[in-house]
């Protein structure tokens, strides 16, 4: 991981967490100061907990933030059940995940939809965490780089910078399966992503953080975080427990 790019460990709680889980978040906050020289920390709880988590953060200066897992592209309107980026930021989010593979698969989100959501996050003043990644079938067909390149081109709006954008590479076949690609495979894809970002966005693209996601856990975090062009992790299930989440952050160089 280049020393110039500070690591980000982002936790995606997905559809998990009730008020009782505030204790886990408080434990994360308690352990965060010891990791201040390692990484920035971000937790994206379900929207029902976003405000409560934000209140726990308070106004103190620390490298810890809360974010959201998705947003609607519009500011407001007749979109029953949806939440705009502005609403999420108002509730305390400073970053919003867009284009997660589960949204792409379960809700049919296309690259153009993801792009609009990324623009919405920027509009509201939030960082867009744009997810890309191939399925098992695409991997087996040798299409990984083609798929990732196409998703990057279609999902990232013009104007991406290191301040408003994070890219997360999540091979779909590795999410929640316990399977992880080899370090060499991760390096190949992350270097490809970096090349795409630099060619399109120049110096800003060279500084955008690229996270790895897909069965990241304490036992493999150190190896993954040592891979060139891996600037942190997007963590799923392991982010639900403070001990695991903090241990993953401790694996950053």
Curated annotation (Swiss-Prot):
Enzyme Commission number(s) from the entry: 5.3.1.1
Keyword line: Cytoplasm, Gluconeogenesis, Glycolysis, Isomerase
GO CC list: cytosol
Known catalytic reactions: D-glyceraldehyde 3-phosphate = dihydroxyacetone phosphate
Free-text function comment from the UniProt entry: Involved in the gluconeogenesis. Catalyzes stereospecifically the conversion of dihydroxyacetone phosphate (DHAP) to D-glyceraldehyde-3-phosphate (G3P).
Family, per entry: Belongs to the triosephosphate isomerase family.
PANTHER family: TRIOSEPHOSPHATE ISOMERASE
Protein name: Triosephosphate isomerase
Native source organism of the sequence: Rhodopseudomonas palustris (strain BisA53)
Gene coding for it: tpiA
């Amino acid at each position: 991981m280049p020393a110039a790019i500070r690591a980000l460990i982002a936790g995606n709680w997905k559809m998990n967490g009730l008020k009782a889980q505030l204790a886990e978040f408080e434990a994360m906050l308690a352990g965060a100061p010891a990791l201040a020289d390692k990484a920035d920390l971000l937790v994206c709880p379900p929207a029902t907990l976003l405000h409560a988590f934000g209140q726990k953060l308070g106004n103190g200066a620390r490298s810890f933030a809360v974010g959201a897992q998705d947003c609607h592209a519009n500011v407001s309107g007749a979109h029953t059940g949806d939440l705009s980026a502005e609403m999420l930021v108002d509730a305390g989010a400073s970053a919003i995940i867009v284009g997660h593979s589960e949204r792409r698969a379960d809700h049919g989100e296309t690259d153009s939809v993801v792009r609009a959501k990324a623009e919405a996050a920027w509009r509201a003043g939030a960082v867009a965490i744009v997810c890309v990644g191939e399925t098992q079938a695409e991997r087996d067909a040798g299409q990984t780089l083609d798929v990732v390149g196409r998703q990057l081109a279609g999902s990232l709006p013009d104007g991406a910078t290191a301040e408003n954008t994070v890219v997360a590479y999540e091979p779909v076949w590795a999410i929640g399966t316990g399977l992880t690609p080899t370090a060499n495979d991760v390096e190949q894809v992350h270097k490809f992503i970096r090349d795409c970002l630099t060619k399109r966005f120049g110096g800003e693209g060279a500084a955008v953080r690229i996270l790895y996601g897909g069965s990241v856990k304490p036992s493999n975090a150190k190896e993954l975080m040592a891979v060139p062009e891996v600037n942190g992790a997007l963590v799923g299930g392991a982010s639900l427990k403070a001990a695991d989440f903090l241990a993953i952050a401790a694996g950053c160089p």
